[in-house]
């Protein structure tokens, strides 16, 4: 879904059929279009984004923090642990916003998804993860809007009480 959301192309076109497909996309995407028009890009995100839009494979020692790279995502702070706290993630995003001044900034959380897989939809842990992310967004939203950003918030593609998305996920 990450590839489709940021490229606007269907799965059969970009070829990312599961999270296990290790590939750097070679089609237009939000990051490349921003750069094509003179903008700067940044991501505080799961390492998949670095692989999808910059290069493969992700190397913890070299790729975790990338500032002012020459790749599709100019600056990134990437994590690989599904339970990476949203408090850290949003701090990473704010660091990038304040210090790199991107025209397009992606902040991608895995915390809600992680709790959903571990405890299922409707669980106390899942609902708490949603609330934590909601509070952080509510606190940061005025700063982002005052800085001239347009905000788009997307959500996961659903999860059931057993912690499964459906499809090929388990």
Locate the predicted segments by residue.
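Feature captures the catalytic ectodomains and active-site-proximal regions of enzymes
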Residues: 1-170
């Amino acid at each position: 879904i990450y590839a489709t959301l940021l490229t606007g192309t269907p799965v059969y076109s970009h070829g990312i059929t599961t999270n296990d497909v290790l590939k750097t996309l070679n089609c237009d995407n939000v990051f490349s279009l921003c750069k094509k028009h003179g903008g700067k890009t940044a991501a505080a995100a799961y390492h998949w984004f670095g692989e999808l839009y910059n290069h493969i494979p992700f190397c913890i020692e070299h790729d975790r923090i990338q500032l002012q790279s020459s790749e599709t995502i100019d600056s990134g702070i990437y994590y690989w642990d599904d339970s990476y706290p949203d408090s850290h993630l949003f701090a990473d995003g704010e660091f990038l916003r304040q210090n790199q001044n991107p025209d397009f900034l992606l902040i991608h959380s895995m915390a809600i998804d992680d709790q959903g897989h571990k405890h299922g939809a409707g669980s106390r842990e899942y609902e708490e993860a949603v609330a934590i992310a909601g509070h952080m967004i509510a606190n940061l939203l005025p700063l982002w809007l005052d800085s001239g950003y347009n905000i788009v918030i997307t959500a996961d593609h659903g999860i059931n009480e057993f912690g499964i998305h459906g499809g090929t996920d388990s």
